[in-house]
Amino acid sequence: MFKRMAEFGPDSGGRVKGVTIVKPIVYGNVARYFGKKREEDGHTHQWTVYVKPYRNEDMSAYVKKIQFKLHESYGNPLRVVTKPPYEITETGWGEFEIIIKIFFIDPNERPVTLYHLLKLFQSDTNAMLGKKTVVSEFYDEMIFQDPTAMMQQLLTTSRQLTLGAYKHETEFAELEVKTREKLEAAKKKTSFEIAELKERLKASRETINCLKNEIRKLEEDDQTKDI
């Protein structure tokens, strides 16, 4: 049953144990060379940094805002985008690290922070000619382990972002499979470690109980001798 946000209460309905929801994302930048330095400011490129869903879905169903922290040389370096497309377009001449912070509608979910090195130049300098676009984007996954009831509802009720074809600059299908395999392997390893710890705990408790019984017997023997 669909609930309104206010109905969940200050704890967002509490944590839903045993639930894991994965939301794949793509983040990065594209850049275009002007062909020469711009006379008024010496800028050489126009670039766009972005965060977008890997699948065709509207992230605003669960994302409140995305914050992009640019280099201090830009006016108002802390940029905030509250609806799709989550992107910032600027011009410049140098590469620098951009800090991306994703905030969620549910205040009880901690923000996710990403770090992206803005790329303007091709590794092959000749590729820069002809105003060819430079692409630097990455696949990642936001994993919600034991989300709140509110967040679970938000994550499972998102709609399509566009009705047309939806694709990325980079082919991530193979990388997605590998990431899934790593995630499954990590889950199995964690389950094994938990089971192992439970066995150790059980053995420790049995040892403690044996020692307690021995101590009790010794105390009883001492009392008998005293009599």
Swiss-Prot record:
Q: Has the keyword Transcription regulation been applied to this entry?
A: yes
Extract the GO molecular function terms from the UniProt entry: histone H3K18ac reader activity; histone H3K27ac reader activity; lysine-acetylated histone binding
- As annotated, the Glycyl lysine isopeptide (Lys-Gly) (interchain with G-Cter in SUMO2) covalent link is placed at K37
Report the domain remarks: The YEATS domain specifically recognizes and binds acylated histones, with a preference for histone H3 diacetylated at 'Lys-14' and 'Lys-27' (H3K14ac and H3K27ac).
Map out region (Interaction with TACC1) in residue numbers. Answer: 168-227
Site, Interacts with diacetylated histone H3: residue positions: S73
Coiled-coil ranges (or none): 178-226
Keyword match Nucleus: yes
Region of interest called Interaction with MLLT10, as start-end residue ranges on this chain: 163-227
Q: How does it assemble?
A: Component of numerous complexes with chromatin remodeling and histone acetyltransferase activity. Component of the NuA4 histone acetyltransferase complex which contains the catalytic subunit KAT5/TIP60 and the subunits EP400, TRRAP/PAF400, BRD8/SMAP, EPC1, DMAP1/DNMAP1, RUVBL1/TIP49, RUVBL2, ING3, actin, ACTL6A/BAF53A, MORF4L1/MRG15, MORF4L2/MRGX, MRGBP, YEATS4/GAS41, VPS72/YL1 and MEAF6. The NuA4 complex interacts with MYC and the adenovirus E1A protein.
Protein's UniProt name? YEATS domain-containing protein 4
Q: Which UniProt keywords apply?
A: Chromatin regulator, Coiled coil, Growth regulation, Isopeptide bond, Nucleus, Transcription, Transcription regulation, Ubl conjugation
- Ranges for domain YEATS come to 15-158
An example Gene Ontology CC term for this record: nucleosome
* A biological process from GO: regulation of cell cycle
Task: Give the InterPro entries listed for this entry.
Answer: YEAST_sf, YEATS, YEATS_dom
* Organism encoding this protein: Mus musculus
Q: Where in the cell is it found?
A: Nucleus
Spell out the residue ranges making up region: Diacetylated histone H3 binding: 93-97
Q: Which gene encodes it?
A: Yeats4
Task: Identify one Pfam family in the record.
Answer: YEATS
Role played: Chromatin reader component of the NuA4 histone acetyltransferase (HAT) complex, a complex involved in transcriptional activation of select genes principally by acetylation of nucleosomal histones H4 and H2A. Specifically recognizes and binds acylated histone H3, with a preference for histone H3 diacetylated at 'Lys-18' and 'Lys-27' (H3K18ac and H3K27ac) or histone H3 diacetylated at 'Lys-14' and 'Lys-27' (H3K14ac and H3K27ac). Also able to recognize and bind crotonylated histone H3.
